[in-house]
């Protein structure tokens, strides 16, 4: 469960290292975001000499959460960290690689480009 002021790791090579959620896209007063939700975030830490810089406002899609995700078949998935992938306005990832495992549910939310870049889909 991601809410405003939550810090997230960045799971791609876009140049950002850490994000802080400032808004959840989709509803005016949603409190929590889950896997597959798009958020507005600010970059808190970035790699030097990369296109994305610190204090830049970006959109990101959540790919991993510490909070459990329960599937219809009864399987429960939980990750060790909260992570997101930086995307552009069309929903395409800004980076060219995705690090770590991501959930299969992203395919249902039409983030197929992120799923194809991921090394492991759970």
Swiss-Prot record:
Asked if the keyword Plastid belongs to this entry, the reply reads: yes
- Cite the entry's keywords alphabetically: Chloroplast, Plastid, Ribonucleoprotein, Ribosomal protein, RNA-binding, rRNA-binding
Q: Name one GO cellular component term.
A: chloroplast
Any one of the GO BP annotations = translation
Gene3D superfamilies noted in UniProt: Ribosomal protein L14
Describe its partners and assembly state: Part of the 50S ribosomal subunit.
How is this protein named in the record?
A: Large ribosomal subunit protein uL14c
């Amino acid at each position: 469960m991601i809410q405003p002021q939550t810090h997230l790791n960045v799971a791609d090579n876009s140049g950002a290292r850490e994000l802080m959620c400032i808004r959840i896209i989709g509803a005016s007063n949603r409190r929590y975001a889950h896997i597959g939700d798009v958020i507005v975030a600010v970059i808190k830490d970035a790699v030097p000499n990369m296109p994305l810089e610190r204090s830049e406002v970006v959109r990101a899609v959540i790919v991993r959460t510490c909070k459990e995700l329960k599937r219809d078949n009864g399987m429960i998935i939980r990750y060790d960290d909260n992570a997101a992938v930086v995307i552009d306005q069309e929903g395409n990832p800004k980076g060219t690689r995705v690090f770590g495992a991501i959930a299969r549910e992203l395919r249902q939310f039409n983030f197929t480009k992120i799923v194809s870049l991921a090394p492991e889909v759970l």
